[in-house]
Structure formats: structure tokens, C-alpha cells
Design a protein with these regions (language model features):
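C-terminal "cap" of GNAT-fold acetyltransferases
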Residues: 173-190, 366-390, 441
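Acyltransferase donor/substrate-recognition loop-hinge adjacent to the catalytic core
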Residues: 149-230
């Protein structure tokens, strides 16, 4: 039977879109079911603040009356204005081992993005690098950690068979608590000099004022990641949502702020691997899922180091060393015996050598793909919400301000009109302990 691709319109289509992964992935395998309620909230254009500066289409592939694949096509106007790009993004990709269906889905996504003037199709991202992103291309036997995607091995063939090529590949590093003796002699001296020589103190986040703490985190996050591949800063509304979402899962022992004179200069965020809990819930907290969750959370023995970053002016002061040492001390006081950190750009040789030097090993690779589209001027649809247009213009204005004038500033200012535009520049996805490649000396982790 032929494949038909249709956009999601009715409420039952949303249910099909959300529930499709349960049909794709074998029970008992590495895939971890997400919470259905949270998936619906993420996709809801009225409730997700991402859509104040973005637009999206959700697509389902049907064969003989049965859904066999899904994908989103979305344009983040704030990202494009911030980076000076014309990217069209794709994500939430799930498909049976059916090349015809995958081709039809990606072709429909490409057509939708092309209609909006995008010159490049980039992904997968659900919806951005601030959430689950990247296609798993190595490490299929391992379960994904919190906020990390998992894909069957045949997805790579489906995507590459459509004509997608690698944009960047990232590494996920595993470290065990037993590596501590090997690690600490290398960086503990840097950490000990941090306060007396640089006036930097490290503390744990205060859950009682989580909103303010998240804003402090965001200031470092934006400074440390500003030029990383695929990055654009979060809006105030998005920060509020992240603060709300983090509250039930945040363990303050794993959330660190480095401060100098009361100002944040470094951050580290590790999340207990709540996928160990979600695996038991099958997507539902009710009626009794919350009881299973309470029991399971006490047995979590892994953590994901989601972010570790330092402001540029202190990247050589040992701030990252201090954060990393404190994370290991936290692990020693907890049940955690294993951590995964990253992602690290595969071509970042200095950083990868540093990770090897502290006893870590690569356990997963994720890849972002791209495909060039027809050359047309970028544009917003005539029916785009006014808020989307304002967000696109504001993103460009912010970028112009940061550029500080000159040719780059003028170019950024021109982007304030989302109908005009220019080809963008790339970036580098820095990662893990230190972006300059020396253990404990700074830089930033990626965030996935």
C-alpha cells in the first residue's frame, strides 16, 4: 500500500503522534517511554513558550490506515536571527524500518521548510539544542539518560538514505566513581587555589529561590555557550518553564554555582537519571504511577552531567576544576556510581584527550544531520503570529547589540527584518570539563 503523509490537525492525530513511539520500539529494550502528559504539553503551541518565536508542523506517515512514522518541521526565528542563519529544523522523528515512509516524511518536512525560505534542513532537534537532540549512531545497547534520545540503529540508514549528511558528531563520555583517584590529583590543586587566588567560591543552588537561581545559571550559560553550534539564548518565558520543570527532579547537591563577588562565573548541573524511574511508569503517573516513581527514585544510581560552563574571562582560572571536584565529592556522598558527561564535539581533539586522561571513555555518539535546500530569501508566513514576528526581530536586535557595531553589527541589525537576512556563520560545540582542552581549565560542556 502507498504511503500518505498528512499534517496533524485533529485531537486524535495528536494522540497518534504522541503514542507512535510505543508502536515503534520493542518493549523491554533500551528505549524509555516519556510521560505522555509532558509530551502533549511540549507539542502544545499555546502552552510551550518556544512558539512565541517559532512555528512548526507535525506530520504523520500512514500506510493502509496505520501510522508508521512521524516528524516535526519547525523554524526557530529567534535562532536564525541570533545566528544569522536560515535553518529549518526537524525533530521528533520516529519511523518503522520503512525507507519509503521515512523518505516521504522527510520530503514533506523539507517542502514545508522550503516554503518558509529556509536554505538548510538541520536536525534532529526536539525543538532545539536545549532539549533532546541528535541522532544516536553509536551506543545502541545502553539506555538513554534523562533528556537524551534513543534511536534504533536503522534510523541512521533512513536519514542518510534520504540524502542527509553529517553536520556535527558529538561524544558522550562515561565516568565511574572509581576513576576519582585518577582524576583528582590532576585537578585538585587548581581547585584548592580557586578561592585564595581568584576569589571564586562554589556553592549549591538554593531550591527555595529556584527561579532566581535559574536566572543566575542562565547568565553563565549564555556567556559560555554563546558561540556554540546551534545555540540561541532562552527567553524569559522559557527560563520560567525550565525552572518549573526542574523543580521536581533537581537535586541541589548536583546543581552548582561558582561566584566571584556575588556574581555567577561558572555553573555545573547534574541530573539524577530519572529515566530509571520513567522506565517503570510506561508514560503515566496516574493512577498508581506516582507510587512506583517514589519507590524507584530512591534507587537511582546514575547521573547525567548536563552542563558545565565558565564565563570566558575566567576560563583559565581553574573554575571548571573546582566544579568538577565538587561533583566527584557529591558522588562520593551519594548512591551514584556512574555518570555520563557531554556532549563533546568529535573533532575537539584537546578536549577528548583530556577526558581520556581522567579515565573517561566514549560510550555513545550522536549526530546532527543537514541537507541543503533551494536558495530563496528567508521569510515569515503572512499568517505568522505577531508575537513570532516580534521575537524574530528582538533576536536580531539582541544579536546586533552583542556585535557592538561595525560590519557585524550592521549585518545583525539588518536581520531585524525577518524578511531580509543573510547566510550565517557556524559555531563550535565545546564540551565537557574545559573548552580549551586542558583538564580543569574552563570552557563549557554542551547541553543536550
Amino acid at each position: 500500500m502507498p504511503v500518505e503523509v498528512r499534517p496533524v490537525r485533529a485531537r486524535r492525530d495528536v494522540t497518534t503522534f504522541v503514542r507512535l513511539p510505543w508502536r515503534i520500539h520493542a518493549p523491554g529494550g533500551p528505549w524509555v517511554p516519556p510521560l505522555v502528559r509532558e509530551q502533549r504539553r511540549t507539542l502544545d503551541r499555546r502552552r510551550n513558550p518556544f512558539f512565541a518565536h517559532a512555528e512548526a508542523e507535525y506530520l504523520l506517515a500512514w500506510r493502509g490506515g496505520e501510522a508508521v512514522g512521524r516528524v516535526s518541521a519547525h523554524v526557530d526565528h529567534r535562532l536564525n536571527a541570533w545566528r544569522g542563519t536560515r535553518w529549518g529544523l526537524w525533530g521528533f522523528f520516529e519511523c518503522r524500518d520503512d525507507p519509503e515512509a521515512a523518505h516521504a516524511l522527510l520530503a514533506a518536512a523539507e517542502a514545508w521548510l522550503g516554503e518558509r525560505g529556509c536554505d538548510r534542513m538541520v536536525g534532529p532537534m526536539d525543538f532545539s539544542v536545549h532539549g533532546p537532540c541528535g541522532l544516536l549512531v553509536e551506543g545502541y545497547a545502553l539506555a538513554p539518560q534523562v533528556l537524551e534520545p534513543w534511536h534504533p540503529s536503522y534510523y541512521r540508514a533512513l536519514v542518510e538514505g534520504y540524502g542527509m549528511t553529517a553536520a556535527v558528531t558529538t561524544l558522550k563520555w562515561e565516568q565511574r566513581l572509581s576513576d576519582r583517584a585518577r582524576l583528582l590529583p590532576v585537578i585538585e590543586e587548581l581547585a584548592e587555589r580557586l578561592e585564595p587566588e581568584h576569589g571564586v567560591r562554589i556553592r549549591h543552588m538554593d531550591r527555595r529561590c529556584l527561579g532566581a537561581e535559574v536566572r543566575r545559571f542562565a547568565r553563565v550559560y549564555e556567556a559560555a555557550w554563546a558561540h556554540h553550534w546551534g545555540f540561541a539564548p532562552l527567553t524569559e518565558a522559557e527560563l520560567r518553564r525550565y525552572a518549573r520543570d526542574l523543580r521536581p527532579v533537581l537535586d541541589a547537591d548536583w546543581a552548582l554555582l561558582a561566584e566571584r563577588g556575588g556574581e555567577p562565573v561558572g555553573v555545573a548541573l547534574g541530573l539524577p537519571d530519572y529515566n530509571q524511574v520513567l522506565r517503570r511508569l510506561d508514560g503515566r503517573l496516574l493512577p498508581l504511577g506516582w507510587l512506583r516513581a517514589l519507590r524507584a527514585r530512591r534507587r537511582i544510581d546514575e547521573v547525567r552531567i548536563l552542563a558545565l560552563g565558565v564565563v570566558p574571562e575566567l576560563r583559565h582560572a581553574g573554575v571548571a576544576a573546582g566544579l568538577y571536584v565538587e561533583l566527584f565529592r557529591t558522588a562520593a556522598r551519594s548512591r551514584v556510581r556512574r555518570a555520563e558527561a557531554g556532549w563533546v564535539l568529535e573533532t575537539n581533539e584537546d578536549m577528548n584527550r583530556a577526558m581520556e586522561a581522567v579515565g573517561a571513555r566514549v560510550v555513545k555518539r550522536h549526530r546532527f544531520y543537514e541537507k541543503a535546500l533551494a536558495e530563496e530569501g528567508p521569510r515569515l508566513r503572512a499568517d505568522a503570529a505577531p508575537a513570532v514576528r516580534r521575537a524574530a526581530a528582538q533576536g536580531a536586535a539582541d544579536r546586533a547589540h552583542d556585535a557592538g557595531g561595525g560590519a557585524e553589527g550592521l549585518r545583525a541589525a539588518a536581520l531585524a527584518d525577518p524578511v531580509e537576512g543573510a547566510a550565517g556563520r557556524g559555531g563550535a560545540l565545546g564540551v565537557a570539563v574545559g573548552g580549551d582542552g586542558r583538564v580543569g581549565h574552563g570552557g563549557s560542556c554542551s547541553i543536550g
